[in-house]
Amino acid sequence: MPLYRARPRSLYSRRRRATNRRRRYRRRRLHIGRIRSKYTIFNVKQTQNISFTFFGTGSPDKNKWQAMSLEAVQSSGTSPKPGINLRFAVFGDRLPGTGNQYHYPFDYYMIRMVKVELRPAFNPFQRVRTQGSTYIDKEGNITTTTSGGEWNVDPYAAMSSRKTWSPHRYHKRVFVPKPTIQQGGTGTNIWSTWYTPGGRQLWLNSIQDNVVFYGMGMSLRQAEDTAAPLTVEATITYYIRFGQWTGLSP
């Protein structure tokens, strides 16, 4: 049997207490934990639905391509603008409250991630099967078509983030949106000329709750002899981060 040299116990060391053993003394009731972060952060998950209608009655012609973005649906009255913005993400299509205000008890926010799920809102057995494309564009310069100006080819065919999409089936895209920062000078462009790369984001003031975050484009080919409206439902899940709790009333 080997012999080991006895080691003296240090003056300040103690035996490790078993993890499953109860504490001998109660915790102090008046102990208040120190706030270690600069300001408290809250993560919120919100889901809203938008319906998009491709094509019209008798237009466009067969094999023409129509393209639109998530911001294609116009707002009705004073309700929030459908799309990727804080006001629509939190309140949906509800009208403003007292004093024509939308209130957030936080000073800052950022939209960390967005999940877009496309589903058919029509009977897939009664329509000719077709296909299209979805692509991610974070600067807002999304190619869209107007009535009578549809393309002969897919507008998003050359995009590196393009994925094939069939309106008869479920389709999902997940991306990190970027807020719109309009260019300076006398330009009339509304898309962003600068944004943080990768998964980084910027804190925005909650007062600017209608800033548009870009974005995703959708294209679809008209495959029937006579065009008819084709409605697609988009379920958008917003992952929002709020900072600096205030709790103040509007």
Swiss-Prot record:
The keyword DNA-binding applies. Keywords: Capsid protein, DNA-binding, Host nucleus, Host-virus interaction, T=1 icosahedral capsid protein, Viral attachment to host cell, Viral penetration into host cytoplasm, Viral penetration into host nucleus, Virion, Virus endocytosis by host, Virus entry into host cell. One of its GO terms (molecular function) is DNA binding. Residues 1-38 are annotated as: DNA-binding. Residues 5-38 are annotated as: Nuclear localization signals. It comes from the Viruses. One of its GO terms (cellular component) is host cell. The keyword DNA-binding applies. Pfam families: Circo_capsid. Belongs to the circoviridae capsid protein family. Self-assembles to form the virion icosahedral capsid with a T=1 symmetry. This very small capsid (17 - 22 nm in diameter) allows the virus to be very stable in the environment and resistant to some disinfectants, including detergents. Essential for the initial attachment to heparan sulfate moieties and chondroitin sulfate B of the host cell surface proteoglycans. After attachment, the virus is endocytosed and traffics to the nucleus. The capsid protein binds and transports the viral genome and Rep across the nuclear envelope. Homomultimer. Assembles in the nucleus, presumably in an immature form, then migrates to the cytoplasm once assembled as mature virion. Interacts with Rep; this interaction relocates Rep into the nucleus. This is Probable capsid protein. The lineage of its organism: Viruses, Monodnaviria, Shotokuvirae, Cressdnaviricota, Arfiviricetes.
